[in-house]
Amino acid sequence: MRITLAVGLCLIACAAVASPRAKDAAKPDNPITAQTRESFRARINENVVTIMAGSASGTDLAIVQDIADVLDDGSALRVLPMVGKGPEQNIKDVLFLRGVDMGITQANILKHYAKTGELGANFIDQVAYIAKLFNEEMHILVRSDVNDIHELQDKPVNFGAEGSGTEITGRLVFEALGIEAREMHLSDADAIQKLKSGEIAASIVVTGKPAPALSNIKDARGLKLLAVPYIKELEDSYYPATLTHDDYPVLVPEGQRVDTVAVCAVLVSFNWNNDSPRYARLEKFVDRFFTNFDAFQKAPRHPKWREVNFAATLEGWHRSPLAQAWIDRAKQAMSTASRDHFDDFVAQASRTSGTPMSDSERADLFRAFLEWTKSHSNN
């Protein structure tokens, strides 16, 4: 027993001696200091911007992912897509939610908040649009025995999730058309099932075509897309649009089309002061976004990019000073290049004719030259 006790005490003593060495071995050679950690945290957050898309099923999430795929290089600029709840909430998130730099909303959101008054009269001064994006078409899925949108008067109609772009646009368009439907708020999948069973009369989907919820329908027997008339009351906020067999092979017969309306999707940000760190990050984003525009026009990017025009204006909205500055610089560069080419052209023309041109002749000729350049660049 004495031998056992001695051995036990020896093992305990060895463990006591070895323990500090084991702890020392576990320590890294170059431990991360608090200062190093803070430096890393600052560096990793320095060039990050976030963009709030709409719901996971909308076209704008694919658009935001395209932006990240093209612009995010992991260090100089990181773009983080975020899944939101739609145009109504996205405006609130851009205004109030920490960490949200930009969001996609719809151009008619101004009319919506003008009606509700929820954000006050001057909220538009706090929001700036970076770019007018693509059109989001209004789809109305009905049973095949419905032939006119006014037949939906007093009928149960699915307007999508509350606060969604579908709900907002659906309400405003129906109001303009003088139609009062019984609003339902269902998912697209549930709405299609209830439409087939006759529990509802129609389901509205507002998103860039092709809408996944509709293009994924396998059995469309008894269903069709309903036309939306483009009346005068819709001209201020909406565009005429069409849905074709190529968009929805099982819902639109070949050779036919369904006329509808579309609302514009808009990329917006908070209207930061130019001394804010957020302003500096947005400036870097805008420069890369606009400069790399051609990359968005090519496969495998979403076909809706072909509708985007960064220089387009939106009535009632304030354009981001960052976006306006980039556009102004681009116009100046184009003008300078055109002027240089034109001066060479005039010099050659003067040498040919042997007679110097007057200022008025140069002005007339320059206007003609710009028109000629524009017509040839569009070919």
Name every feature range the model reports, one short phrase each.
Residues 162-173, 241-315:
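Ligand-binding clefts/hinges and TM-proximal coupling segments of bilobed small-molecule sensing domains
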Residues 27, 33, 190, 196, ...:
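An extracytoplasmic/periplasmic, membrane-proximal ligand-sensing/linker region
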Residues 10-19:
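Hydrophobic h-region of N-terminal signal peptides that target proteins for export
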Residues 46-71, 79, 136-193, 197:
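Bilobed "Venus flytrap"/periplasmic-binding protein-like clamshell domains
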Residues 68-69, 80-121, 192-194, 210-217:
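Pocket-flanking alpha-helical
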Residues 46-48, 58, 74-76, 86-89, ...:
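Extracytoplasmic
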Residues 19-51, 145-156:
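Immediate post-signal peptide segment of exported/extracytoplasmic ligand-binding proteins
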Residues 107-108, 117-118, 179-277:
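Pocket-lining segment of extracytoplasmic ligand-binding domains
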